[in-house]
Amino acid sequence: MKKLLLFAFILISSYTMNAQKDEQKQLLKHVVMFGWKPGTDTVAIDKVVSAFGNLEHKIKLIKAYEWGINNSPENLNNGLTHCFTLTFSSEADRDAYLIHPDHKAFVAVLSPAPDKVTVVDYWVSK
């Protein structure tokens, strides 16, 4: 019985250590896509783009930031035109970002411009 318990402990410990190593080899991508209400002027859109870009300098949990405008010839973007990608080291960092005062201030800048918003998070290997 003691050997069985010891074996189970070693097996669980090994699995836990490997899971932690795998998490350290990954980065969390947080993708936000916006579509705009008809008639939204470029000044309002530029204000959102600028405010989103400033978050990287205000919230140190953000490891990388990039953005772009849709140029896919497939016409499958469903009205979403602007795509922003933030990179985090962990889900905990992403979660802290979501409640960060600077992120909340950014969300206030959004109103009332976007018509559509989609958010997708996923893990990638480093």
Predicted regions and their residues:
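Surface-exposed, polar helix/loop patches in the mature regions of secreted/periplasmic/lumenal proteins
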Residues: 83-126
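Bacterial Sec-dependent N-terminal signal peptides
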Residues: 1-23
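Low-complexity, intrinsically disordered short peptide segments enriched in small/polar/basic residues
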Residues: 6-9, 14, 45, 59, ...
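Hydrophobic alpha-helical segments, especially transmembrane helices
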Residues: 3-4, 30, 95, 104
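Alpha-helix boundary/capping residues
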Residues: 11, 52, 69, 101, ...
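Short S/T/G/P-rich N-terminal loop/turn motif that feeds into the first structured element of a domain
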Residues: 16-80, 89-96, 122-126
